[in-house]
Amino acid sequence: MEISVASVTVSVAVVVVSWWVWRTLQRVWLKPKMLESYLRRQGLAGTPYTPLVGDLKRNFSMLAEARSKPINLTDDITPRIVPYPLQMLKTHGRTFFTWFGPIPTITIMDPEQIKEVFNKVYDFQKAHTFPLGRLIAAGLVSYDGDKWTKHRRIINPAFHLEKIKNMVPAFHQSCSEIVGEWDKLVTDKQSSCEVDIWPWLVSMTADVISRTAFGSSYKEGQRIFELQAELAQLIIQAFRKAIIPGYRYFPTKGNRRMKAAAREIKFILRGIVNKRLRAREAGEAPSDDLLGILLESNLGQTKGNGMSTEELMEECKLFYFAGQETTTVLLVWTMVLLSQHQDWQARAREEVKQVFGDKEPDAEGLNQLKVMTMILYEVLRLYPPVVQLTRAIHKEMQLGDLTLPGGVQISLPILLIQRDRELWGNDAGEFKPDRFKDGLSKATKNQVSFFPFAWGPRICIGQNFALLEAKMAMTLILRKFSFELSPSYVHAPYTVLTTHPQFGAPLILHKL
């Protein structure tokens, strides 16, 4: 009997180990080689597959080298931010494949193909190759199919233009407080002062999203912002280990800290959401902030079609991260570029004077700022917050004249596209807001070559929010100060999920 039990145990163990070996072999060798063969038969050029790691090691090595030294203000930023994709583009042409571990990733530069990917949201879905990213922000941005449709329907009312216009006073309050602090610094230094604007802008946009999303101040939401910033750094570090199967489950110090930070964020958000729900049940009038509008929209859904408390919390996480991060990045590069291009700074200031005079900025006036809009679009073109988007294919698909197998990813290289000379002309790398003077369609020649907020059905729901907030901030800043780059400024854009200034952004502010 003992022999029989032992034999069965050994047999089961052999089967389990054999199954695991077979699955591993299939994942790290057989399937990648099959997909590589398929893509090459389509005429696609790309890198040869390296078992398990793919191109990650080469990519990280080039990125580390690029980040090790700053660049000149007039240099192209793409070799510093996306060195490996740029090299592959030069080597293999405008459609090529590389490897994210064992997953082939096809980079496309054709606007018609990009348009097709954006439009077919049920066929080209969000890639989930790095689950740790969901710790910092999941929600609407990470969903597909019917779940995405449901969440988009519920969240949409919170971002209607009329609702966003009602948030302009909150924009004004948060921006005025920071401008007031800068004014004190400059006054103390007798009309001119060096200020690293980066941490101030981080604080300002955090305060804006705290007020407009949750009706609170930055101090109340400060812990969430601190935890999300810490998570962003930890996730970037963990990304280098992403190729190791099951790495996120290893009890490393970094993994334990990520999970602890994520738990703390959920605990804080659960308290915020539950407090609102209790107030609603007690008969209090709903708040007119993003969370209040979201809860009202959710309660208005038929039974079974609303969001759970957990799902509401995920959307709140996304509000906090995307609502703060995107506008901070847009504002810092706007001020850096206007410091370089004093003529455009003067034009923007003159427009602000013409539209508002001495009046307090309002939504109607902000929407009349044509020069400001041109400047912001050009900044978004040259320094997009997110440098690429990725989509996944789960079944054989036709994309233009390509037939692509299930199991591959599509990379939409925002930065490379928006600085591409074939699409934007020989001056693609230059700061020329005039290219947008007749609107987006004319500037892009009706092609999908400008998509800092994505494009099509999945275009960023907070686009108008970010642009209106940026216009308010720049209006108040331009009224109060002129500014130029400090001699201590070091030009070193790099990515920490979004495009940050690696060594801050010290400017010289002059009081007007």
Curated annotation (Swiss-Prot):
Binding site residues for heme: 460
Membrane-crossing segments per the record: 2-22
E.C. number(s) listed in UniProt: 1.14.-.-
Keyword flag rRNA-binding: no
Names of the cofactor(s): heme
Record GO cellular component, one term: membrane
Family matches, as InterPro entries: Cyt_P450 (IPR001128), Cyt_P450_E_grp-I (IPR002401), Cyt_P450_sf (IPR036396), Cytochrome_P450_Monooxygen (IPR050665)
Keywords noted in UniProt: Heme, Iron, Membrane, Metal-binding, Monooxygenase, Oxidoreductase, Transmembrane, Transmembrane helix
GO MF, one example: monooxygenase activity
Membrane-related topology note: Single-pass membrane protein
EC category name: oxidoreductase
Protein induction: By cis-jasmone.
Pfam assignment, any one: p450
Similarity comment text for this entry: Belongs to the cytochrome P450 family.
Name of the protein in its database record: Cytochrome P450 72A13
Native source species: Arabidopsis thaliana
